[in-house]
Amino acid sequence: YYHLSYWGRPHDYMWLCTTQPGLIYNEMKQAYDHNAREVWIVNVHDLKPAAYDLELFLDMAWDINSVTGTTLNNHLEAWLCREFGSQAGKKLLPAMLEYYRLCGIRKPEHMGWTQVELSNRKVHPRGRSQVINTEFSLTEFGGELDRYLESYEKIKTTVTEAEKLVTPDRKDAFYSHIKYQVFGASAMA
């Protein structure tokens, strides 16, 4: 049973699909290596943002050897090219790899650093702890917050450029599978 989305404590993540393909590969390969080979179940809340992660999961469930640790990026690139055309797909690959890297640092849904029902936090009347600012530093580590935000701006620019290469019949899919996620994550960063 694998979560591409999660609803529960201390934080859910159901709005975007931010699970890195490398994590999916590693955990599902581990499950397979420990003899979980008959039934794989995936929890996914919104299919459109999770389209690639879901396909990766299903490809591995069908044939564990269809993807390896060294061909994972090729798998993503092939999916991007199939869905949005070769030019757009190749342009999107570095942006999507960076998107997953940034989401691995901190899930966009978790940027407020809010926790629920924890005794070590000041609790608001609604039962949730107080929202506090991110602990990304403006000054330490060479301005990590600025680097984080600049990284999102760069991938937004790449996504916007790639969108121009997408045929009109694929624009809706592009929005729901790529642009919505990147721009949504950036807005919360």
Model-derived segments and their meaning:
Residues 76-189:
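C-terminal non-catalytic alpha-helical accessory regions
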Residues 1-67, 71-77:
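Catalytic-core regions of glycoside hydrolase
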